[in-house]
Amino acid sequence: MANKDHSLDEKIIEAARNEFLEVGYRNASMRKIAARAGITTGALYTRYENKDVLFASLVYETGLLFEKEFSALKPEHYRIAIREGKFSQLTAHEAGKILDIIYDHFDECYLLFCCSEGSTAEKYYPLLVRSKAKQTARFMNSNGMAIPVETVEMLMAAQYSYYIEVLKRRYTKEQATELIRNVMTFSDAGWLALINDKL
C-alpha cells in the first residue's frame, strides 16, 4: 500500500476552511474543496470519509476548549462569589475567557457557531447551553433557589447568543470586549434579581 502524502493535509484544511467559511457546511462541496486543494475528489475521500468528518476535523479542538473552560468554573465558585458580592467580577472573568477563545480561534469559532447548519456539529451549541444550564440549575436548587431548568436554559441561551452576534458581525476584540461588558452588566443585574428573589 502506498504511503499517504501528508504534504497535502495542510492544503486540504486550508481549502476546506475557506469553502465552509464562504458558503457554510450545507452548501459546501467536497468536489470544490478538492479542486481548491489541487487534488482529486478521490484523494480527498481517502483522507476524509465524508463532508461531515472533514468539517468536524476543523472545529473539534475548538469545541474542546469551550468545554474545558466551562467545566473549570465550578458551582462553588458562584456560591462564593455571590456570598462575597463578587458575582459580576466572576462573570466578567468568564466572559473574558470566552472572548479569548473566540479571538484566538476566530475562524474555527465562526465555522462552529455560524456555518455548521446541516452538520453533526450543529448540535454542539444547544448541547453546550443545555449542559451549562443544567449545572447552573442544580447549583441554584441545591442552594434553596427553586428555579426550573427550562428557565435557566432560556436565560443561558440568550446570554451566550451575545457571543454569536460578535462572531456574525466580525467585531474586533476591542469592540467585542466593550459590547460584552455592557450586555453582561445588563445580564448580571437580571441574574442577581432572580437569585435574590428566590433566596
Please place each PLM-identified region on the residue numbering.
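Hydrophobic alpha-helical connector segments
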Residues: 57, 71-103
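Helix-turn-helix
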Residues: 11, 15, 19-53, 57
